[in-house]
Amino acid sequence: MKINISNATFSSIVGIGQKVKKAAKETGQEYLELNRGVNAVVEIDLTKVVDGINFNSKEFQVYAPNLGIESFRESIIGEYFPSMKIDEESLNFVSVTPGGMPALDLVIQILNVENVLFPKFYWGSYSKMATIRKRSFSFYDSIETIETDKLNDSTCVFICDPNNPTGIKVSDSVLLNKIEELTKKGVIVVFDSPYRKLFLNDDRFFDTISKFDNLIITESFSKWIGLSGLRMGFIFCKNKDFNSELNIRLLYEFNGVSSPSQMIVERVISTPEGKEAHTHFRRITVENIQKNIQLLKDYQLLPEEIYGKKLPIGIFAVIKKSEDFLFQNRIGAVGMDKFVYHDKDYWSSYSRICVSVKHELFNKFF
């Protein structure tokens, strides 16, 4: 059978997860799966949220509209862009996607650019998707060092803040100035910040940057309200040509995103019951994350060359232990060589771990 080879490799994170599960099964011992990329402190309680959903309704049981259920897109605008007038035009700025990764892949597919700039420390899937879509890519060291005057409308810059894998958070003023500077130059900015609302839910940053042209926002709900199994995200963009092509690709790639998932997430972000549920979920999750990060600091496991005097924000942290060392101590982790394109040998002595687990369990292994 003749096939088209993507030249991308299978996800290391998935492979490590399989290795950890196999070891736990074979040894009968408990392993701490910090290789994962999901919140695992507590589950969000949907008991009161789903009470208002009619599982026998037509809306629940049939295909959703191509761009997403209209009331859900209205709720997204209300949650992320509260100063924006909700009308036919603004509703077309929001397209519902089955999670964050498909959103990013669609963006990479659609943009006709000569080069995509990723951060030095980056989620490995960025480059894998670019490879599959045959997009050239390179890297920048930090937001502050991006040389805007050397870029033009043939460049796309990905910004992940707080960063995955490091958890480094750039100040909002620096972010805002750089996004404005880049977009005014015609550079396309893809803002991928799925962990922000876990910690900063009531801020207006998304609302503020939404005024810029040449900006695309990709979002994954699972990083701040849980429910990764529902596969729910969205793309925000004001460019009509981009949205027209996105509408076509959404149709032929997905033919609508799960109606039940949209209805559940809509109620989580828009109803009193849902807001109470995700507020509790976020509070408990953040409390445990902060305790875990403090433990890493106390044990001097956070590399100063990455963090200096700062602490990571988000569900990930980098520590001064290798993937193999941690595995020998029954901890699943992902070597930092999977999150850089250069100097892989050097960074292989460090690992990214997920710190979004119960503190008692985390403390037991460290």
Stretches with model-predicted labels:
Residues 7-99:
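N-terminal small-domain helix-loop-helix segment of the aminotransferase-like
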Residues 33, 279-293, 300-321:
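Conserved glycine-rich beta-strand-loop-beta hairpin in the small C-terminal domain of fold type I
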Residues 40-45, 165-168, 197-198, 224-227, ...:
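Short catalytic/ligand-binding loop motif for oxyanion handling, primarily in non-cytosolic enzymes
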Residues 52, 75, 79, 214-283:
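Conserved core segment of the aminotransferase class I/II
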Residues 59-182, 196-212, 216, 359:
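Conserved core of the PLP fold type I
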Residues 70, 82, 171, 328-333, ...:
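PLP-dependent enzyme catalytic core of the Aspartate aminotransferase-like
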Residues 193:
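Walker B catalytic acidic pair
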